[in-house]
């Protein structure tokens, strides 16, 4: 598992407006952590198929159907970045392009006011 990989993850339990259920996520944590088997925590951005969210904020990044194995148009919700135990990651769908990862990095910077 590497930075930019898209996995199906079990986001349960969650509460409030957090993304929940079984859904795709993109790994954003450093590969130094990702490739260390004893390191259990993985930092991810959840994806949603509610593409109208992409119009609401600069922290949402559109990912078209087919990219990274996604079966539907999706939106990376950079404002909902979260940490998961790697056991919650189920099957790998694919990998985002470097260009798409740069868009996600910009979304993360906007979400955390790092611009």
Regions found by a protein language model. Name each.
Residues 1-115:
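Conserved functional hotspots at enzyme active or ligand-binding sites that engage polyanionic ligands
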